[in-house]
C-alpha cells in the first residue's frame, strides 16, 4: 500500500503563514491534498500569487494539488477599525456607522447601506462567528446604536450575522464575479459559493463558470437547509460551513445538521467537506484540545470526504503542526476496526443507473476477491466519484489523462489519482496501472485488481465495464 495513504482528504486554507513555496511544499508533505483561498481576505493579485506558488510546488513534486477559491458572497463584514481592533465590554453602548473606516476608537464601521435600511430595534447583531453579540437600541439613516451583550475583542473585517433581519441578496456579488473570472483564467479547480439560499444561486454561478471548474455549495443559511436535496443534486460538492451556520441556527442544532448534510451528499454521490474551528486552538497552541480531536474524528467517522483547516493554516503560528495533527487523527480513525462497517451502514440505496450499479458492484467484487485496489479509468472523474460513494475498503486508484480531473479528485474520499496521457486503449491502461501499482507496492504479484471504465475510453459519462485481472 502507498506510504501514508489516507482516504479522508485534508483541505488547508492558504494565507500569510503558509503562502511561501517552501511552506506549501511542507504542508503537502505533511498531508495537505488541496488548498483553499479565502477571497474574503484576498485580492486578485494575491489570488494569482497563491495559485502560482501552489502550481510551482505541484510541478516540483509531480503530484496533483487541488485549488478551491472560496467566494465571499453577500457576507456582511466589519470595516476597518482604528488600530485594527477594539475591546467591547458587556453593557457598553456602541455606535455603528455606514462607513468603510471608523473615525474614532469607539466607532464600529459597517459599509452596507442595506443593513441600516432593514435592521430593527431589538434585532441581534452577531460578529466573528457569534463570539460578540450586540442588541439594537436605535436606528437612523446611517447610524445604529447597540448594547454589547457578549463582550470580546473586535477586529477589522470580521463577519456579521443578522439572523432576524431580512436582507434581499443574490449569493453572487459583483466582487464574486470578478474573482470567478480571475479563477477561471488561473485554472482553479473548485469554486465555493457562499450564503446559498436556493438552487437558483448555483444555476447563476454555472452560467458564468467554466465547465472544467466544479462548484462547491457552502451550506450556512437556514434557507439552504430547506432546499438541501435540490442543492445537493445541482452542486458538484457541499461544504458544511459551521461558523455561520452555528450563528444563524441554534448552535446545538449544528451537529445534527452536519450528519444530515453528509448523508445528503453521499446519497447524491457528491463530495462533502466539514469546515470551521476544527483545530481552532492550534492557531496559537502546539496541541489541540481533546474536544477538537473528537470533532475531527467524528467528521471522519461520519464519512466526510474532507476536513478543513481555516485560520489554523492561514494565519496560525503552527500550520505544519495543525496539518500533522489532522493527518494523525484521520489515520487513527481509518485504522479503527469499526470504521468500514460504520460507513457501510450509512450507505443509502444505490441510485438507479448503470454507472452507479457498476461502482457498487466493484466494491463488493473487490471485497469478495480480497483485491487490494479498485482501478477507475476516467476522463471527467465521475467513475472515481461513484466508486468513492460506496466507501469501499480498498484503495481507489483513478487513472486519467487530464490533470484538471486529477486536481478535482483531490477532495474525493479514498481516491488516489495518477495522470497518464500515454494510453489510448484499455490494454495500455491496464499495463500502465500494473506497473505503477507494483512500483508503489499497492499490489503484489498474484493479487487481483478490479477495474471499472467506460468504453470507448474517450467518451464521457459511460461507465459500463467491470473487469478482474490478476497481476503477474
Language-model segments: residues:
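Non-catalytic helical/linker scaffolds that mediate oligomerization, partner binding
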Residues: 1-472
